[in-house]
Amino acid sequence: MSCATPVDAAVELHLFACDECGARLGEIISLAEGIRDLARRGSLLLVVSDTFVDRLVEEGLRVRQYAPPHGGSIACTVTAEDDVLIGRLSADLSRAKRVDLCLCNEWHIERIRLADIPFDPAADAVLFQQSITYAKAAPSETTIAKLLAVDEAGGERLLGEFTFHHTRTLPGPGAP
């Protein structure tokens, strides 16, 4: 064994000796691999890093990215060949302690909130992966992404608002 601490060694010994705990660990590993696979296939909505996006490109995946101007909008779509869909939201994150990403409909009604997202205060943007599975099946629609700084008391300050005008181009249910 090459465990770093005595606690690690004790846990490892237990996992090898206890079939039930070993089986549970196997289930957790399978779950983690499944989540990683969904993320790599672009099927999850999550915050990602430039490094993650670069790795996907290096692996040969077709990554479609949209970066609407701060406070502005952008027309967007996906094709059958796209593997991953990334939104790049520029904002001054330097004074934020906590950031939430809200996805709203065209009437500014919040549909999804990713609370306390990972971010780098020195970065000039937050990158999020929209589910490519959803984007390929979605009807033409408008989504407004809002980055909010949230203080300790729960107060919110708008860091940026970005509008995505999605046009469906793939045939199927929901197509025009």
Segments (PLM) and residue ranges:
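Short beta-strand elements
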Residues: 151-176
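Short alpha-helical interface segments
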Residues: 15-63
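Short, amphipathic alpha-helical interaction patch
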Residues: 1-17
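Charged, amphipathic alpha-helical segments
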Residues: 82-85, 127-133
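Short, aromatic- and glycine-rich surface loops/edge beta-strands on solvent-exposed regions
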Residues: 99-102, 134-160
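Solvent-exposed serine/threonine-rich low-complexity stretches and specific carbohydrate-binding patches
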Residues: 106-130
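Contiguous beta-strand segments within globular domains
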Residues: 68-95
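Solvent-exposed loop/turn segments flanking beta-strands in beta-repeat/beta-sandwich domains
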Residues: 93-105
